[in-house]
Amino acid sequence: MKAVSVIVDSCVIFPMPLCDTLLCAAEAELYCVHFSQEILDGATRNLVKKGRMTEFKAARFQEMIKNTFPEAMVEVPASLVEAMTNHPGDRHVLAAAIIANAKIIVTDNLKHFPKKALEPYWIEAQHPDVFLTQLFDNDPESIVEVIRQQAEELKKPPLTVAELIDNLEKNNRVPEFVSRVRLYEYCNLVIETAKKALTVLGTPAAEGGRSYEGGRYRLWMKGQTLTITAKDSRGEILRVQNMEIEGSISSEDVKLFQIFAQRLEQELATNGVE
């Protein structure tokens, strides 16, 4: 199946962790990315203005994008831009989408792309959270592998997968995508730690099965159903039932379960329990 063609607006190229994820996903051929020169200029102009890059580095950044995606650039005639009816500041983006035969414009500025202006061209504007979440739903392992590879290639500073996910979470830019990626990447760690804790430390529960009351979480398991409930305002954060996993775990949850797993291993080793 041919990857969908997408125009990426300058406003989502500007935040670097998000830009990297979008470009890495395109490099992995999860979608076909397109830009115009005006879109790239808008992105690098903001990067220079905010002090994130010098003019020289901005030029090299553009060159890198063009070299990585040689088929991505589209030339947009001024006459087509003038014919667009969306927000004047982003008419060049819609025109670029038409030239690229793109089906989606990924943008933070959804209000600049009203449906009425896009429908004649069968184009949809999507928030980056919606777009990345759709990529996840289509192929979870591939998009999570993109995140793993992205983390592996970051050197200044080096980042773990967990730290990269935390960076994407900042400013609440792509919350649903982050939630799904984190659960996919770390659910096995959390679930196996919970099961081990219930086996070693759990006691019979009033509702049947076994439970463990920790300082921050209540673990409960009966048959093939496992729940983890946070002792804060969130309530249940993870449920395994009928071979399906549902929930939303935070960065702090992952860290605490990693520590808990280490302590369990130490306790088992000390007590000689397998």
What are these regions (language model features)?
Residues P70-I104, N138, L154-P158, N167-N188:
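Active-site neighborhoods of divalent-metal-dependent phosphate/nucleic-acid chemistry enzymes
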